[in-house]
Amino acid sequence: MRTALVVAAAISLAGCEFGDLGPSDRYQSDFHYTFEMQPTGRIDAESFNGSIEISGWDQNKVEITGTKYASTEALRDALKIDVHNTPEMVEIRAVRPSYERTGNMGARFTMHVPRKAMLDRITTSNGPVKVRDVGSAAHLKSSNGPIDVTNVSGDVDAHTSNGSVEADTIRGAATLKTSNGRIHAEDVSGALEAETSNNSITARLDTAPAATTKLVTSNGSIDLTLGSAPKGDIRAETRNNSIKLHLPADAAAHLVADTSNGSISSDFSVASRGDSDEEKKHRKHMDGLIGAGGPTIELSTSNGSIHILKGSGI
C-alpha cells in the first residue's frame, strides 16, 4: 500500500467571507487526487458533515476532487484527508484532529471511479450520498442525510437516518433502510427490502422480481406497483396508515390481508369460503386466491385501509 500523491495543490480560501455559507464553511481548502486502479477494484470513502458523490466512468483510474472546511483556519488545517491506494483499492477518509471532536468542520468528496469498481464502504454523516452508473455492489451509509442511487448493476445496501432513500434502476437486490425519511424505489430487479418509520414507502417495479419484496414502515403509507404478475412473495406492513397494491390484470397470487379500524377493498375477485361477494370486497380480513393462486401476498395495517387495485399504471 502506498500513499497517493496529491495531483493538485490545496487551494486556500482562508479568511474569505461567504454570504451563503454557515460558520463551518468559512475556511476552505480544495484537494484533487488521481491514480490508476484495476477495473474491478474496491472503493472506501468516509467523511463527516459533508456529501459524497460517486459516478462510474469508462477509465481505469480514480479521480477525486473535494473540499475540506471549518469554522476556523486552525481547525481546517488540522482536519486531514487521508488517502491510500494500491492497484486493487482506493481509500479516502476525512480525519478529525484527535483533540477536537465537536468543532464545526467537515469535508465533501466528488469521485469518478471505474464503472465496475465495488463501493465497499461509502459513509458520511450530516450529508447526502449520491451514486450513479456503477456496475458492481454498493454499500452506502449516512446519518441525517439522504441517499440517492441510480443505475447500479449489483446489490445495493443503503442505510441512513432522518433522510430519504431513493433507488432507481438497480440490477440486483436492494436493501433500503432509514428512519423518519421516505423511501422511493423504481425498477429493482432483485429482492427489495425497504424499511422506515414515520414516513412513506413507494415502489414501482416494471418487472416483478422472482425474489421476495418486503416493505415495512410505521405511521406511513405504502404504495407498491407491479408492472407484471408477481413471481416472488410480497410482504407490506404499516401502522396508522394505508396500503395500496397495484397489480396487472393477469396477476395470480395467494392474498392474505388484515387491518383493524380500516377496511379492505379489492378490484380482483378473491376466491375464499364463507363470505358474500360484497363482504369479500369490504372487510377487515381477506385470505384467498387471486386467479389461480401463486406467490403469497401479505398486507397488514392498523388504523388504515388496504386497497388492491387492478392496473399497474406503468
Where in the sequence are the language-model features?
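Intrinsically disordered, low-complexity terminal regions
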Residues: M1-I314
